[in-house]
């Protein structure tokens, strides 16, 4: 990336090898199958295929920032069961000096937006800051506070 600061001076900036991602492990401790139902990207995207999770099973997926972007890894992933949707949100910042990592979950009749989960709108609980356990609607979750975050979800239904 080059920028011209004045007519005669050019400066070159590099973003280095900064990478943001979150790996999510979903443990299904219920007697219901969790059917993969897509995602809503805010920054970055799924780097792996989202798969169904059988009762007693575990699913894993990876969300990465967009290549070369000075942005974090942020989005919502959805699982459907019966007439409900499990929405899982994680937000891993690009700049740890300005922002924190956050996570949230919600079981509802619709796919929850990132805004609702991040801000605690429309009946969603307030998000949980990384490094703390959150619990909502029979779902426990924990997000580590590092650039390559681990998002652990235990769904009990």
Swiss-Prot record:
Its main location: other. GO terms for biological process: cytolysis in another organism; monoatomic cation transport; pore complex assembly. Pfam families: Anemone_cytotox. GO terms for molecular function: channel activity; toxin activity. Keywords: Cytolysis, Hemolysis, Membrane, Nematocyst, Secreted, Signal, Target cell membrane, Target membrane, Toxin, Transmembrane. Octamer or nonamer in membranes. Monomer in the soluble state. In vitro, interacts with folate receptor alpha (of target organism). This is Hydra actinoporin-like toxin 3. It comes from Hydra vulgaris (Hydra).
């Amino acid at each position: 990336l080059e920028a011209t600061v004045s007519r005669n001076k050019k400066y070159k900036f590099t973003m280095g090898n900064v990478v943001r991602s979150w790996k999510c492990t979903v443990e299904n401790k219920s007697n219901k199958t969790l059917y993969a139902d897509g995602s809503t990207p805010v920054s970055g995207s799924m780097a792996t295929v989202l798969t169904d999770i059988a009762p007693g099973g575990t699913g894993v997926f990876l969300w990465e920032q967009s290549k070369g972007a000075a942005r974090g890894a942020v989005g919502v992933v959805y699982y459907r069961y019966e007439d409900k949707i499990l929405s899982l949100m994680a937000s891993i910042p690009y700049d740890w000096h300005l922002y924190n990592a956050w996570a949230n979950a919600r079981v509802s009749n619709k796919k929850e937006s990132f805004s609702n989960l991040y801000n605690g709108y429309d009946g969603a609980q307030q998000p949980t800051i990384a490094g703390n356990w959150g619990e909502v609607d029979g779902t426990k979750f924990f997000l580590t506070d590092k650039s390559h975050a681990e998002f652990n979800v235990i769904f009990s239904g």
